[in-house]
Amino acid sequence: MDSSNCKVNAPLLSQRHRRMVTKDGHSTLQMDGAQRGLVYLRDAWGILMDMRWRWMMLVFSASFVVHWLVFAVLWYAVAEMNGDLEIDHDVPPENHTICVKHITSFTAAFSFSLETQLTIGYGTMFPSGDCPSAIALLAIQMLLGLMLEAFITGAFVAKIARPKNRAFSIRFTDLAVVAHKDGKPNLIFQVANTRPSPLTNVRVSAVLYQERENGELYQTSVDFHLDGISSEECPFFIFPLTYYHTISPSSPLATLLQHETPPHFELVVFLSAMQEGTGEICQRRTSYLPSEIMLHHRFAALMTRGSKGEYQVKMENFDKTVPEHPTPVVSKSPHRTDLDIHINGQSIDNFQIAETGLTE
C-alpha cells in the first residue's frame, strides 16, 4: 500500500476521525459534564496512582508545606495565648511558664514546626514539660506527621512497583498486515517482550469499534489465535509472538473491508500477561486504523541462528514488512465468496475467502 496516496485520498485520515485509543494504549475519551466532586475524591489513592510523576511530586511537596504551615500557626497561637511573644525568653518573669522557648515570631514558629516534623533535634527552641497545651500539640503533630509520611512513602513504592511499568516493555508492531496463511487471508500483527525476563499466561483479545450513522459506537469481538496453540493462553512469552485472525465470511472485518468507502473503524488489541517474579497481571493496549492495515504484505523474519546455534531475535526487522503475492485458495469443494477489499477508497486485488465446510 502506498502511504503517500493514503494521505491524499483517505477520508478516514481527516480531522473528523481521531483515535479512541492511542498507539501506546492511552484512552482519548473525554467525559464532558461528569459529576466529580466528593465522589471523585473518594478514590484519592487511585487519583494519585494515575497522576504523572511531576504532579505527584508537586502534590506531595505541597502536602508537607501545608502541614508545616498549619502547625506553625498553631504553635504561634499557643505562644500568643500563653503570653510568650512579649517577654524576654532568656530572663522570663517569675511565675511564668514558657510553653516553647524562643518562639517570638511566626518565622520561629515555622522553624519549630519543621524541626518537630522532621525530628532533626531541638536546639534553642524546645517545648516545656510544664505546659500541657504544648505537649498535646506536640503529640498531635508527631502523630499526623507519621501518618503523612507513611502515606507518601507507600504511594511512591506503589507507583514504582505498578505492573503498568512492566507493560511498557511489551511492544506491538506499528502496522498490521493481511497475508495468506494455509491458503486463507489472515489479519496479522506481532508483539514482542523487550526484556529478558519472561511473561506467562499471555492472553490476547481484540475489539472492533465502529461508529454508526446515529453517532453510537458499536463493539464487536475479534478473535485472534497464536500459531497452533489450542488454548487461549500462551504459557511462555520470551520471544516475539505472531497473532492471526482468519478473515472468513463470518469475520466482522470481511464485511467491513469489502465496502468501497468503508466507515471509520478502530481495532483495539488488548494483551494481558503475568509477571513471573511477582505474579502480578500487566496489560498493554494498542489500536489499528484502516490506514495501518497493509494488504498483501507479511512481516520480515525475526528469528535467526547465531554462530553457536543459539536463537537470536532481530528487532530491527520487527516493524518491517515485505510484499506478498496472494496465493489462491485450494479446497476440495469450497463455497467461495469474492470480496473486493478497499482501504481508504483504494481498490485492492480480490481475496477469495473459502468456507471450511464441504458440500455433500
UniProtKB/Swiss-Prot annotation:
InterPro entries documented for this protein: Ig_E-set (IPR014756), IRK_C (IPR041647), K_chnl_inward-rec_Kir (IPR016449), K_chnl_inward-rec_Kir_cyto (IPR013518), KCNJ13 (IPR008062), Kir_TM (IPR040445)
Residues exposed to the Extracellular side: 78-105, 123-131
Catalysed transformations (reactions): K(+)(in) = K(+)(out)
GO BP term, pick one: potassium ion transmembrane transport
UniProt activity-regulation remark: Inhibited by Ba(2+) and Cs(+), although sensitivity to those inhibitors is much lower than in other Kir channels.
Compartmental location: Membrane; Cell membrane
Membrane topology: Multi-pass membrane protein
Chief location of this protein within or outside the cell: membrane
Subunit structure: Homotetramer. Interacts with RAB28; the interaction may facilitate cone outer segments phagocytosis.
Chain's role: Inward rectifier potassium channels are characterized by a greater tendency to allow potassium to flow into the cell rather than out of it. Their voltage dependence is regulated by the concentration of extracellular potassium; as external potassium is raised, the voltage range of the channel opening shifts to more positive voltages. The inward rectification is mainly due to the blockage of outward current by internal magnesium.
Protein name: Inward rectifier potassium channel 13
Gene transcribed to yield this protein: Kcnj13
